[in-house]
């Protein structure tokens, strides 16, 4: 079997992996099963905007499937070779096995009831519900109205749900599976510096116990890239940031540190938020996943 030695190896071409790569200014090898960047926010929006692009090619990614790994030694085995790294970033993401199936089934029905296995995925449930309501469907959701992000968020979400005409159900028929890791990876619990072992970093949805959220994943990728460049020595401070589009002109811009035991909560409602989301949907595909100046939003 061939062997290769690299300075920095990034596993995964999703939100976290590509932003780590961009932060390192391309000075790293990135491998993934997929050479395309998929912006899932735009893909979900595609159910109401059929011509919206949600994917972009990533020519700098080497298509590889990881079959084994020794994290402490920073050795990765693919189907073609063994790769030895000085710095290793684990960012393979996770998979919601039935997500596409739930959307397809919901699109085929006129009356829909939705739920999730994990409360952390309620933001996806609500966004899907708002878009289905926009299509004129009768939609009911099983939700806490994002109460785990703070009472201010819950109150605003309840109002948005009411205005959009979404109902509530205790017995949802279509349930979005929890995101699961893919062999040979598992969910990891890194330090507050997102380090698992010396020079082995974890980024994105593969972090155990965190919400599986694209904006958050991008920030972790930027952070670990900065750590390798010795530019970011402070600990990573996660924040849940999401724009919830109500489907009929109004939206919420949500920020909260509640999932990590913090007390910061901000929720802003306006007609500008959905327009900002439309910009973001196009920006990330055009920029091939690079967060860029949007890190300041």
Kindly give the residue locations of the regions a language model identified.
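C-terminal, flexible cofactor-proximal segment of oxidoreductases
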Residues: 16, 225-297
């Amino acid at each position: 079997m061939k062997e290769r030695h690299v300075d920095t190896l990034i596993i995964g071409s999703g939100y976290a992996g590509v932003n780590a790569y961009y932060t390192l200014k391309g000075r790293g090898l990135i491998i993934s099963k997929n050479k395309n960047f998929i912006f899932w926010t735009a893909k979900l929006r595609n159910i109401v905007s059929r011509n919206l692009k949600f994917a972009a090619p990533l020519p700098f990614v080497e298509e590889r499937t990881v079959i084994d790994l020794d994290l402490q030694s920073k050795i990765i085995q693919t189907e073609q070779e063994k790769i030895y790294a000085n710095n290793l970033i684990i960012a393979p993401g996770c998979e919601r096995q039935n997500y596409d199936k739930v959307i397809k089934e919901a699109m085929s029905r006129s009356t829909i009831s939705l739920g999730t296995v994990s409360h952390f995925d309620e933001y996806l449930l609500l966004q899907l519900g708002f878009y289905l309501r926009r299509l004129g469907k009768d939609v009911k959701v099983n939700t806490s109205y994002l109460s785990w992000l703070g009472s201010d968020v819950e109150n605003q979400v309840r109002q948005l749900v009411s205005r959009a005409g979404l109902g509530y159900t205790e017995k949802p028929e279509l349930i979005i599976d929890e995101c699961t890791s893919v062999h040979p990876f598992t969910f990891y619990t890194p330090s507050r510096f997102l380090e698992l072992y010396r020079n082995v970093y974890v980024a994105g949805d593969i972090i155990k116990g965190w919400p599986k959220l694209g904006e958050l994943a991008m920030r972790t990728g930027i952070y670990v890239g900065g750590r390798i460049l010795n530019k970011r020595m402070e600990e990573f401070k996660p924040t849940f940031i999401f724009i919830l589009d109500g489907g009929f002109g109004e939206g919420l811009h949500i920020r909260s540190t509640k999932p990590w035991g913090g007390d910061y909560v901000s929720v802003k409602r306006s007609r500008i938020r959905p327009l900002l989301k439309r910009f973001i949907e196009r920006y990330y595909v055009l920029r091939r996943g690079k967060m860029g100046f949007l890190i300041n939003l």
